Design a protein with these regions (language model features):
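Hydrophobic residues on short alpha-helical segments
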Residues: 21-25, 52, 64
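N-terminal regulatory/sensing modules of transcriptional regulators
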Residues: 1-4
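Noncatalytic linker/hinge segments flanking ATPase motor cores
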Residues: 12, 63-64
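Recognition helix of helix-turn-helix DNA-binding domains
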Residues: 29-62
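Helix-turn-helix DNA-binding segment
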Residues: 6-41
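…primarily DNA-binding HTH/wHTH and HhH modules…
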Residues: 73-74
Length: 74
């Protein structure tokens, strides 16, 4: 079954995973992301692991490229 054209890889992410993705794509360190979102570094790392798996990516660099190409970050 084909997916509709208007769906994106990031549509499968939770709101918090999406927030973490945007910070990671901008190169924000995990410690700073935790402070910004009021969550622990371990929780940030868990979100990172899950969102990379969901999006079938292996690195923050891939994430950054995706986010930039899809106008999710400036």
């Amino acid at each position: 079954i084909d997916q509709p054209d208007d769906t994106s890889l990031h549509d499968c992410l939770s709101e918090r995973e999406f927030q973490v993705m945007c910070f990671l794509a901008k190169g924000t360190p995990i410690k700073e992301i935790g402070k910004e979102l009021f969550i622990s570094e371990r929780t940030v790392s868990t979100h990172r692991t899950r969102l990379l798996k969901k999006m079938e990516m292996k690195s923050n660099s891939e994430l950054a490229l995706y986010a930039y190409k899809n106008n999710l970050i400036e």
